[in-house]
A protein has these predicted regions:
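Alpha-helical protein-protein interaction/assembly modules
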Residues: 586-598
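Mature extracytoplasmic enzyme cores
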Residues: 73-585, 694-767
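C-terminal accessory/interaction regions of large nucleic acid-associated machines
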Residues: 636-737
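Bacterial N-terminal signal peptides
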Residues: 39-50
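Signal peptide processing junction and immediate N-terminal pro/mature segment
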Residues: 48-65
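N-terminal secretory signal peptides that target proteins for export/translocation
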Residues: 1-34
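Charged, long alpha-helical assembly modules
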Residues: 596-668
Length: 767
């Protein structure tokens, strides 16, 4: 029996989902993916079609020992041989440096190290990637599972593994073997669901991360976690990442330098893990990845480095399909005739208070993609760039093996990675930026801001734009490039791409305050030392305050004329703001006043408050709140803005009574480089970080690559480990740790060395 979802369920989650279905005017630029599809994971219930009792049950859920798909077994390596070949060097911050004779052995060790440090998160990511989250998390996870099943992530991933050969297949096999080896040697670890990992899971994880976390779910940042000024500012445009690169002409030591600065959630599947893989085959990759990735996807090797930020290329389209053949409910119009839709079923297990409930859902798809909604008698299907083709793992692997800018561009020219800006620097002094995306070529005859006619063959995608057709900047005269989830047409001050040379549907972003402050920093005439480069990664100048405080001052002058008594009460606070240097610090009291005022003003404005002196009203409310909670409105920012570590999955509430650290960062919509987004929590006076500067790395590409890095908390999720919260203390002080790269340096700062499965027998440092 099929359970239908109440209409109220859709109303609370369809916000912006099918904007294309409602727009009447042609668009001038692509609508933001985050706005169109941010909550589609909940809409998938619209995919649930009438299910007849005579229809066969769906596929067996993946990830169980009874699963007998063709993709289950590859040429799996002998784990004992791999384990004996690998050495894991843990430096004094717990970062694993994996040394092995070949790339596959390093991946095996990297999987083992991840499982040691946070098996709970690795497994959770894969549970979601397989569309089985409801089995452990209950009904709240059902929308995610249904989207996963609608996108057929399991089938596509199994098929991709089957057609994969060579190194990528070896990597998949080795990663699964590493996780399974960990479970075999740690019987005290009890998985919530997955007792054996299969090689094809890596492809499922890639699809889940790309299409469910980023394209549909905004990287796992919960909408209710960061929403203080969403009605006033376009939060989707401000939550993101920073990346910078400078050429030798801007560097005091004559080397290119790179800043890697993704702003990801501190908890859940989007958090970062740092590691270093060194193979005797020449692979030497250091950086960060999500838990569940087989190697770092941002970072550097001995020749070059790169970073990513989220961008919004138009890689999704909706098609209106006509199912109007009475004799055949699966027939849909196409051209002069009909095509046959495919119908299939999926069985989903859902954890309940009394056990596990099993439900079966029916899905339908055309050649464009799965049916996701019905509008005016037509059924809408969604098409996603590169969902079926895959190839992302191959592209990232080739990027990590590159030795020059030409090789790096050749690796990216596959355009298998459907989105993400990329920024690059190398030891030859080159810098490079590309607005990467698998952007479909489309006929200009149609308005792609709305669902297009699926029966018209002219609406078919005409392939993808090539890598050379994407906006990009190489070695600009300005000597720098930056991207902060911002338009590629303002990447630098000299040498930007010409917007008129690109189709209007290609680029979805405008400028952002973070990009504006970044260009100001990078355009300075002085040359950057490595120390200055590292310091600027945590810059706390508040650009937005330069605009807001003068406007607030004007309104205060009006208030003095209209209500002198009310103005006298606000005068000390206004004076503090006007005298502020507009730089955040943990000791800054004006920063507290301004940041909370900005949020309150946005909330009031978004709620439709038409008070002509709304800025003053917001300031009064913030002052009252601070006096209520702290006994004074003069409260240091570090007293309010805190860093606290809780359970890795993000399910544990913050507490004012738990250990936490003061932090100077602020939300990106204030135009600050040091991004630190907080979540107010009922019953607590302080606010705690949930996203922002999550992994930061600064790299100097001299003859010997020099790097520093920092994770927001530490390398492991084990509260009993010294590496659970050790990096947080540096982070809160806006400091980095060394990211040792050469083996002699690693051994000089070694905590322990061991082979997988033999960690209780620590090897000598000289091994």
């Amino acid at each position: 029996m099929i359970e239908t979802v109440p209409e109220s369920f859709f109303k609370t989650r369809l916000r912006g989902q099918f904007h294309k279905a409602r727009v009447s005017q042609p668009r001038t630029r692509p609508k933001r993916i985050a706005r169109q599809f941010l909550c589609l994971i909940s809409v998938v219930a619209m995919l649930l079609l009438p299910y007849s009792a005579g229809t066969a049950l769906g596929k067996t859920a993946p990830g169980t020992r009874s699963n007998k798909t063709a993709a289950r077994r590859g040429s799996e390596p002998k784990p004992e041989r791999l384990a004996h070949a690998v050495t894991i060097y843990r430096d004094i911050y717990g970062v694993p440096h994996i040394y092995g004779p070949n790339d596959a052995s390093c991946v095996f060790g990297y999987a083992y190290a991840q499982a040691q440090d946070n098996f709970k998160q690795v497994e959770d990511s894969y549970i979601h990637a397989l569309g089985r989250a409801a089995e452990v998390d209950g009904p709240k996870a059902l929308p995610s599972d249904l989207l996963n099943r609608a996108l057929e992530i399991t089938r596509l991933s199994q098929e991709e593994y089957q057609r994969t050969t060579g190194r990528i297949r070896e990597i998949c096999d080795a990663f699964a073997a590493g996780l399974n080896y960990y479970l075999a040697h740690n019987p005290e670890v009890h998985p919530r669901l997955i007792t054996r990992f299969e090689p094809w899971y890596l492809f499922a994880f890639n699809r889940y991360a790309l299409y469910q976390l980023f394209i549909f779910g905004k990287a796992g940042i919960k909408d209710n976690e960061i929403k203080p000024a969403s009605e006033y500012k376009d939060i989707a445009a401000q939550i993101g990442s920073n990346m910078w690169a400078i050429s030798p002409q801007k560097s005091a030591d004559g080397h290119a330098m790179l800043l890697i600065n993704p702003h990801q959630p501190f908890f859940g599947p989007g958090q970062w893990y740092e590691g270093h893989l060194h193979s005797d085959e020449g692979w030497d990759m250091s950086g960060a990845s999500f838990f569940g990735s087989p190697f770092p996807t941002i970072g550097h090797n001995q020749y070059l480095g790169w970073s990513h930020t989220v961008n919004e290329p138009d890689i999704i389209d909706l098609y209106a399909e006509k199912f109007d053949k009475a004799s055949d409910p699966l027939a849909y119009r196409y051209g002069d005739g009909y095509r046959e839709a495919t119908k299939w079923t999926e069985t989903v297990k859902i954890k309940t208070g009394s056990g596990v409930e099993t439900k079966t859902y029916a899905f339908k798809k055309t050649h464009h993609g799965p049916v996701v909604a019905e509008r005016a008698g037509e059924q809408l299907t969604v098409r996603l760039a590169m969902l079926e083709e895959g190839g992302q793992l191959d592209e990232w692997y080739a990027m990590s093996k590159s030795k020059s800018m030409a090789e790096f561009k050749a690796a990216m020219s596959k355009v298998a990675i459907p989105m993400f800006n990329a920024m690059y620097a190398d030891r030859d002094g080159n810098i490079f930026y590309v607005y990467n995306g698998a952007v479909p070529k489309r006929s200009t005859k149609f308005d792609w801001s709305k669902p297009v006619d699926g029966s018209n063959p002219e609406t078919e995608w005409q392939g993808y734009h090539s890598f050379d057709e994407l906006p990009q900047v190489t070695n600009p005269p300005s000597g720098f490039v930056q991207n902060c989830n911002s338009t590629p047409f303002l990447t630098t001050t000299e040498g930007n791409p010409d917007k008129s040379k690109f189709p209007p549907y290609m680029v979805g972003e405008g400028d952002t305050p973070r990009a504006q402050i970044s260009r100001r920093i990078l355009a300075k005439e002085n040359k950057f030392t490595y120390e200055e480069w590292a310091k600027d990664a945590f810059d706390t100048h508040i650009l937005q305050a330069e605009r807001d405080i003068p406007a607030l001052s004007v309104d205060f002058d009006k208030l003095k004329q209209q209500d002198p008594a009310r103005a006298r009460k606000l005068e000390p606070a206004v004076a503090d703001l006007k005298g502020w240097d507009m730089v955040s610090s943990i000791d800054s009291k004006p920063m507290t006043l301004y940041a909370l005022w900005f949020e309150r003003f946005g909330q009031l404005k978004g709620a439709g408050d038409k008070d002509p002196l709304l800025r003053m009203k917001a300031l009064e409310q913030v002052i009252n709140d601070l006096q209520r909670d702290f006994g004074t409105w003069k409260v240091a920012w570090g007293e309010v803005n805190r860093l606290e570590r809780r359970d890795t999955l993000g399910d544990q509430a913050f507490s004012d009574n738990a250990e936490s650290l003061p932090t100077a960062g602020g939300p990106g919509w204030l135009g600050v480089v040091f991004n630190f987004y907080t979540r107010p929590q009922k019953g607590e006076k302080r606010r705690y970080g949930v996203a922002g500067h999550s992994f930061v790395s600064v790299i100097d590409f001299g003859p010997q690559v020099q790097a520093r890095s920092i994770l927001v908390f530490g390398e492991t999720a084990d509260p009993s480990s010294p590496h659970y919260f050790d990096q947080a203390k540096l982070y809160a002080q806006e400091q980095f740790k060394p990211a040792w790269f050469a083996l002699p340096d690693i051994k000089a700062h070694l905590e322990r060395a061991y082979r997988p499965g033999e960690e209780t027998h620590t090897m000598a440092a000289g091994h």
